[in-house]
Amino acid sequence: MSTRPADTDISKLPSAYRNFYSACRHFIPEERIYSDPLRTLAFGTDASVYRLTPKLVIKVRNSDEVSRILGSASQHHIPVTFRAAGTSLSGQAVTDSVLLVLAGGWGNYSVSPDGEAISLEPGILGSEANSYLKSYSRKIGPDPASINHAMIGGIAANNASGMCCGTTDNSYKTVTEMKIIFHDGTMLDTADPASRAAFNASHRQLLSSVERIRDEIAADNGLSALISRKFKIKNTTGYSINAFVDHSDPIDIIKHLMIGSEGTLGFIAEITFRTIIDHAHKSSALIFFPDMDSACRAVMQLDRETVSAAELMDRLSLKSVEDKPGMPAYLKNLDEKVTALLVEVRGENHSQLEQKTQQVKKLLGEIPKLFPITFTDKKEESEALWNIRKGLFPAVGNVRRVGTSVIIEDVAFPLERLADATLELRSIMVRHGYGDAIIFGHALDGNLHFVLAPDFTQPQEVAQYESFMQEVCAMVVNTYSGSLKAEHGTGRNMAPFVELEWGAQAYRLMRQIKETFDPQSLLNPGVIICDNPAIYLENLKPMPQAHEIIDKCIECGFCEINCPSRSLTSSPRQRITTQRQIAALRRTGADPVRLQRLEEDYVYWGEQTCATDGLCATTCPVSINTGDYTKYLRFTSHGELANATARFIARNFSGVTTMIRSGLNLADLMHKLLGTPLMLRMATGTRSLSSAIPLWTPWMPQGGQSARLTGQTGGRGKPKVVYFPSCVCRTMGPALNDRDHRPLNQAVLAILDKADYTVILPENLDKLCCGMAFDSKGFFEAAESKIRELEKALLACSNNGEYPVFCDTSPCLYRMRQMLDKRLALYEPVEFIHDYLMDRLVFRRLPETIAIHVTCSSAKMQLGEKFKVVATACADKVIVPAKVGCCGFAGNKGFDLPELNAAALAELKPSLPGDCTSGYSNSRTCEIGLSQHGSISYQSIVYLVDRCSEKRPERVEDELLESTNWV
């Protein structure tokens, strides 16, 4: 952790910023204001191709803080920019001034009794909003591709949309009420008559300006017609001036103007949406046409009453994914002009679904197709089809040259012009050197995306991009009357072209809107309204080479939702951004002082607080595991002494674990003698002397026991299983306050015995380890020696993989699956119980409410559903806390860096109902932290299964027959 006080960095700022900082410090704690080089760089990064580094980053937690900050910003004339999840693509969430980041809080919501409306604070993810509506069979209208990662504030501020919502169910069309904070800090609640009346009195001049613009548009039939026509297709270029045509009340106009305003008119503190039906029944078809014209003619025949989505993919799009695992073989044999439509229909029931699929076939009957239309409602087959579409963007990210950026441009055309426009777009791409760029999009909306990968470190490629954009913009606007931005927002990227698309009169009114709402031009200046015609070519983000593990990162931020340290220190995207900067500074030698500062601060903010769980890779479009890079950094930092120590521990593993067990037993004895309060005070005082002393908590385990077979398990001719008790469970037993005080291996042997398995233990068990503890710390040599030692032992006792291997710890099993001989059939507790034991035991469901925690490794092995099945066989009510992912305990980090565990599990206790008295998981160290922060005992799922299962009666009879001495 950096030891430099914030004042060191603050003193270097211009005086206006120093004064602004001092004002904010009266109501924002110092730990939520960042001014150092690392965090301003890291938090300043978003998913766009632009890089601006803020002077200050402030984490805001509620509306009052935003209101007071805006008041101070107005007083000191300081520009501010709002940031939600940072997934926007057009440069609307970057700044070189003050960045306000939503952090903590902002998660309140309410659903109407019938589910037809939902009120949401801006920090809620789009997918979370839909989860709140799931029980009503409804969802929010806007459906951007980033819905699992984007926050409601950004979705609304950008009027973001996706495959299904079109122009009828986007944020603009479904917003009903809003809480808005204006440039002077004033709050307006449009649902509250008193707030509306107060605003009418205090901001009469603003409302009068809105009314004047409304009246001017209404008096000009040509302008009104232009606005209506342009918003018949998707359009996020400029402001939502259709608000002046669609509404007459000035506050209703303001409410709709805020949609798509990108933080330039005010801050959306809460929004209420009208929800839409979420049909459960879906069917998909991938339809191939001989050329683009045929595909676009097919789109013209479809409508949203019949089809919910129709995704267009040109031949280069299909080619980009044809070699990926799971892709259909026939993709490789298609002609170069072939174009595909991926169509989805939805219905309330199977009958309605069948009607719609037949209707699609009828509508497209006369249009030439390469193959007959075949729909599937099977989940796995539909997922295979949609993986083609989802794989397009990652395919480009994976094959681009190191150092290049990724740009996803976003245009829309009137549907009747789509075919010609697409072909002309392709010819422009070829002419400007982007002939390998793919084209895909939401065909029902005439909305196309195309992906470029320029190297903006090369001046000639910047010039190439400039000339390309000039020609594309002219073509979209002048030839086809299209939208330069359909759903990604104007930002900096399209700000210089707003007047080109809208014309002088409409653009003049947009300027008036900006001046009315932001008279000092302090709200996100340079976005939407901008006097700099070259802003889209300035401050282009460098993507310097750093290391092959992370070089493919496109900085989209999709990784961040899974990161346990994201609210404590940094996220995977921020780690990669920082490492790229460090690599560039090392290479150029340009700023040694800055380099040293970044390197020093990164130790805590980047390396030490990385849990290396790898969940970031599961949502990364290009599958980057930032944890692997962290382990590489740890590996490179080790000297010979550290490596020698690791090798010594690996060679003497049995003795080391015996010592740890003894230490844990001593601590447990002291806990029993002193009691929890006194022990806790003593342990806290001891740790205050040095952070190197592990943190003791009341859930610290006692020493474990090595597994021993005390008698015959199973009977003659019974199936065999190899049981490998992990070293962590051999070392760590239950805690004093745990419900079941047996060592885990005893519970495992008990359920295997009930299921009539003959159990085999590996020889020399006490020295065996999967090596994960070494691997996570970057001791790769020691880790490799332990995994190979284990491999040899398991092959021997499983008869070279003939018998399944049961490991009682999920993270260890995950590593074993990655590293061991593929002949071995390896299972962790949940999967083995689900696949092997549930039909061999009788379960009695307990009248209890329990919680389960799906560990990172279980999530990566996609065992979440099996975990639920096992748990629901055991208890009446099962809780899976929605906002709890990786626990952040990360081996020993829960002891050494308890703040990481606390940050990761901040939402655990609030998610547990009062009648939930126990929790279950499948990793001993994770269970320690879960118990501490959930305030209930978490133990292995094995204990629960043992408690509520019995032998099947027929197996009892078999045992009696076997044990009887017949005469």
Which residues does each PLM region occupy?
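Terminal amphipathic helices with adjacent charged low-complexity linkers/tails
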Residues: 271, 305-402, 437, 441-442, ...
